Amino acid sequence: MTRRGLAAACAGLVGVALAVVALPQAGAPAEMILGTPPNYGPAAISEVPNAAAITRRIWMPGLEDGYNAQGLAVAGGSVLVAAYRSDSPDVRRGPCRVFRVDSTTGSATAQVDVPSPCGHAGGLAIADRRLYLADTRTLFMADLDGMFDGPPPRFRTIPLGPGVTGALAVSEMEAIWLGTYREDGPGRLFRFMTAALDRLADGTVLNASDAASQIAIPSHAQGAAIDTAGRLWVARSTLRWGELDRLDVTSGKVEREYQAPPGIEGIAFDAAGRLWAVSEAGARHYYDSWRGLVLPFYPLIFALDPAKLK
């Protein structure tokens, strides 16, 4: 039986399950969202916390092809989103792709495939005009200029050593941060200077000892970004809930906590101070299974006004 068939067969059981599991409520209709909607899912996205702080919504590209959004970075008037492709809810790795999206119109303007061994594309960062893509055990880097407009870019790969995991990435002017994802306790965020990364010989492993600094970050960390005041923001989530934490970048102390859309992944600030984010809630390989009957549907790129968060 196909996943859609299984979902249909389970529909009769859902009425009983509703006594225990509440289905996500509908939020904004599809016509209020920029970009191209997928041909699956409900007619409206799910209601989410802090919706009043959201100033723009864009459909994530590649949804129908099975791409699951992970890392995010901002490059001028474009939002870049890294994703992996999967057709099974139990498989969370696959071919990686970076999508470029116009932040004003919501149009997907270009895309670049990332070579093997990329399989999850957990983090995306920009520093010194280079794009860094953090995968579980490998850091990919390539020149950003002309990346989407010419021949396929040449990615340099840097293996990640013990303790350093590319679950998320943070952009700075002359540095990037790589973070670990943990569910059972705090993760860690490591700061690497781009000059030091440039000096690494091909094949040299990047170790925790190479970091200029490191701090602890909360559990379930999916993305992070630094605002103009130098404060660290961390996106935390599962497919059912989301949260934005504001931390002191030196001590790692959590200063504020805000509810956020479920499935929130990569985040980044633009020049205007808006916080851009992307959610994997509603990715096709989850929604084509029985999980689509109970999970929130919010497969969007969205911009937040931090001043409106409550």
Name the predicted role of every residue range:
Residues 2-62, 293-310:
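Sequence/structural signature of beta-propeller modules
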Residues 74-76, 126-128, 171-173, 226-229, ...:
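Residue-level detector of Asp-centered blade-edge/turn motifs that repeat once per structural unit
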Residues 79-81, 130-133, 140, 175-179, ...:
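Conserved beta-propeller blade signature
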